[in-house]
Amino acid sequence: MAAAAAATEQQSSNGPVKKSMREKAVERRNVNKEHNSNFKAGYIPIDEDRLHKTGLRGRKGNLAICVIVLLFILAVINLIITLVIWAVIRIGPNGCDSMEFHESGLLRFKQVSDMGVIHPLYKSTVGGRRNENLVITGNNQPIVFQQGTTKLSVGKNKTSITSDTGMQFFDPRTQNILFSTDYETHEFHLPSGVKSLNVQKASTERITSNATSDLNIKVGGRAIVRGNEGVFIMGKTIQFHMGGNMELKAENSIILNGTVMVSTNRLPSSSSGDQFGGDDWVRYKLCMCADGTLFRVQVTGQNMGCQTSDNPCGDLY
């Protein structure tokens, strides 16, 4: 190789040497190989699939978009609620125009307020200012005050109070009880100025009136007076006015103690003619024993008296 190189240098020093086509091709191939090796120096082939991927891709990207959209919707709802509260409470540069908050826990409304349901806290008080009325109005609906099972309903045509234990009305200044249904401690009295009491059903031990006034019980339909251990009616004069029938029922006996008067003005009378010829009517005669016991005797003929063996008077007849 050294001799060939020396010969080549000797030939080249004498002048250009003509090379064959084969030698030129080999020389060109060697030059290109050397050039390519120099171009790829420091180059390392990298597989992109094996690289660490950064950012949110695939399902994580979709989840991130959903979270962002949800936060945006919540922000819009929060903005709407804030605007509504701002418009209702009327918050301005000088504070709240519709209400005041005090350090003692008092909440004061400075204008007409529209509310649905109010839930006061434990031992809370709802009231008005001094020398001013507290006006509570329901829009075509009753106003209901309720605490547990006790309820006060104020409607357009009536006011109803519902309670399991009872109720009391007292003067807030003097603390005097004006009206109470605690029969064990206070006797039931109608308030001053109240002339009548309208109830559907009343359960009590005794019903009395003043010594100078009458006790009137009036009903539009049917009145039922019932006692678990008997019914006692006492008075200077007792009158029953009925448009229909009066029925007295007792397990043991009915005692009428006093002067008993039966007005026959409204009793039906038979028409003239044959009074005992037809079978459509059954007639009775009202009789009384010496002790005041009333009984009836069926009338079967004319001029019939109360003499019958079947009577509660014993051997009197």
From Swiss-Prot:
It comes from the Eukaryota. It is found in: Cell membrane, Sarcolemma; Cytoplasm, Cytoskeleton. GO terms for cellular component: cytoplasm; cytoskeleton; sarcoglycan complex; sarcolemma. One of its GO terms (biological process) is muscle organ development. Residues 1-31 are annotated as: Disordered. Residues 86-317 are extracellular. Keywords: Cell membrane, Cytoplasm, Cytoskeleton, Disulfide bond, Glycoprotein, Membrane, Signal-anchor, Transmembrane, Transmembrane helix. It is a single-pass type II membrane protein. Residues 20-31 have a biased composition (Basic and acidic residues). The chain crosses the membrane at residues 65-85. Glycans are attached at N157, N210, N257. Disulfide bonds join C287-C313, C289-C306. Disulfide bonds are present. Residues 1-64 are cytoplasmic. Cross-link to form 2 major subcomplexes: one consisting of SGCB, SGCD and SGCG and the other consisting of SGCB and SGCD. The association between SGCB and SGCG is particularly strong while SGCA is loosely associated with the other sarcoglycans. Belongs to the sarcoglycan beta/delta/gamma/zeta family. Component of the sarcoglycan complex, a subcomplex of the dystrophin-glycoprotein complex which forms a link between the F-actin cytoskeleton and the extracellular matrix. This is Beta-sarcoglycan. It comes from Bos taurus (Bovine). The gene is SGCB.
